[in-house]
Every structure is written in C-alpha cells, then in structure tokens.
Amino acid sequence: MRANNQIHNALYLAFARQQWAELRKSVPLTLSESDLDDLRGINESISLDEVTDIYLPLSRLLNLIVGAKQQRGLVLNQFLGRVPPKRPYIISIAGSVAVGKSTTARILQALLRQWPEHPKVDLVTTDGFLYPLSELKRRGLLQRKGFPESYDMKLLVEFISKIKAGESLVHAPIYSHISYDRVADTQQAIEQPDILIIEGLNVLQTGQDTHVAIQQPFVSDFVDFSIYVDAEEPLLKEWYISRFLKFRTGAFSDPNSYFHHYSELTDDEATKIAANIWDSINGPNLNLNILPTRDRAHLILRKGTDHMMHQVLMRK
C-alpha cells in the first residue's frame, strides 16, 4: 500500500472534493434535475451537487486542454502550409463493471456540448465491439464476456483509427442489454465530432497487458485524454448486486431479455447469483485486466459510498 501511495504521489496531484470543486470558477450549471434524470444510471443517486462539484471543474479542464490541442493544430497547419482533415479529440473513460462509467460519460458529453469551441460531442461504448453472442459461444468465451479476449479488437482499432484519421463518416456497432448481443443491421453513425468519448472496461489496455508477441495498436494509442472511475472492490460488488436486483424487476422482466429467467428469482436467490457472477467473472476481470491499467489514466475519479466522488487525482 505504501509503494502504491508513493507512485500516486509521484505521478498525480491529489484533490479532495472541496479543493476540486473550487476549480469550477465561473462555469455555469446548465443541467436541470430533469436532465440529470435522463443521464443517471439505474443504480446511482447522483445529484446536481455532484455535477457542480466534480463534473463542472472537469469540463472546464477538458475545455482548456481541447482548446490547447486545437491551437497547436493551427500552428502546425501554418508551419506545414496545409489544412488536414478535422480530427476529433478523443477521451476515454475506463473502470469496473457497476462503477458508473456510463453515467460519467453521459454527463461529460452533456456538459462538453455546452462549450462553443466544441459543440459536437459523440459517445461510443465498447460494448458494441464485443463479439456477437454466437461467436462468443463458438470460442468458448461466454463466461469470459468483458475480458479483453471477448472483444473484436481488430474491429475496434479499425473504428478508432478511422476516427483519428478524420474520416467524414465512421460506423460503430450497437449493443443491446436486452438481447445481450450486438444489434443486427443497426449501427451508430459518427460524423466528424469535435470530441469523441469512448467508454469501456479495457480502453486503457496497452500491449504490455497482453501475451501477444507481435506488437499491435490498442485503443489507448489513439486516446488524447483518459479517465479512470475508481472505487474499492467491496463497494463495486455491492453496487453490482444492487443493480442486478433492480434489473431483475426491470429489464429482466422483458420477455425478450436474455436474462428473463432471472426475473422469477427471490431476493435471496438473485443476491446469491449476482454475488457468484461477481466472484467468478467481474471481480477477476477487475483485478487481472482493469485495475492494473488505472495508473495510466490522466485523471482518476475516486468514489466512496453512494457513488459520491471524494477525491480526484490528476497527472502532473
């Protein structure tokens, strides 16, 4: 633990919640409670105070960083005497299952759109790049879903490299949490946004995390700014179980849901199954593949109880 703290002290500036909140300066709050309702995850009680204290300072920081990158591009264009295609600024958001990555991504998207310098902000989740269910079954990876090998990395890297190259239209596959599979014949169109947010479990992964002898590009090679949403594992497991119980009476009750058979479970049965899924799949994936990438992030958002951020770590 001491060695880990020393590494963090060397790499990061640490801000307590109130210290970070003061960095908001005069950035206005443009979201209402109604807006926030649309952005919340199923198991999160995020408040406007959380947006004000954590996300507004972060949107201000990102606006400044994106502006600096845009200015650098203008200087290079002047030096080279040419105008290259528009290239989006790419932000990645990583973290465990149930930590709230998707909510963080949606809130940041909503806030970053308010800045006149970059009004077009798109969001893509890596869930769509999981192999189709039939392929996962064929490869014997159904119980490894979410692990790095369950993703079509070739397709994902092709997608993000086209985005980075400034292609005018790029398509991303869409994932359904109802069917637990890619949506056939439906794709998300990405048309040269100012900023692209890509959210997923393993977006901080590099070649150092694989046993492949041949070097190959990873999502992290194309990312301009990376965020890791962090929490202690006991909290993550608790949040996962709570989310599972809510899905049981919500999404799982849909007859078309892949997990419809869970909808008839008692509370005790559902809790035991969710705990087992965590212990056998999500927990090992966190400790083997996700958590080891945390200290590569430019920014770490640390959560405590009730999904409240209590510390922000920013790379020096």
Curated annotation (Swiss-Prot):
List of residues binding ATP: G95, S96, V97, A98, V99, G100, K101, S102
Record's keyword annotation contains Transferase: yes
GO biological process: coenzyme A biosynthetic process
Annotated metabolic or biological route of this protein: Cofactor biosynthesis; coenzyme A biosynthesis; CoA from (R)-pantothenate: step 1/5
Catalysed reaction, written as an equation: (R)-pantothenate + ATP = (R)-4'-phosphopantothenate + ADP + H(+)
Gene Ontology MF, one: ATP binding
SUPFAM superfamilies: P-loop containing nucleoside triphosphate hydrolases
Family statement drawn from the similarity comment of this UniProt entry: Belongs to the prokaryotic pantothenate kinase family.
PANTHER family, A to Z: URIDINE KINASE (PTHR10285)
Protein name: Pantothenate kinase
The species this protein was found in: Shewanella loihica (strain ATCC BAA-1088 / PV-4)
Lineage: Bacteria, Pseudomonadati, Pseudomonadota, Gammaproteobacteria, Alteromonadales
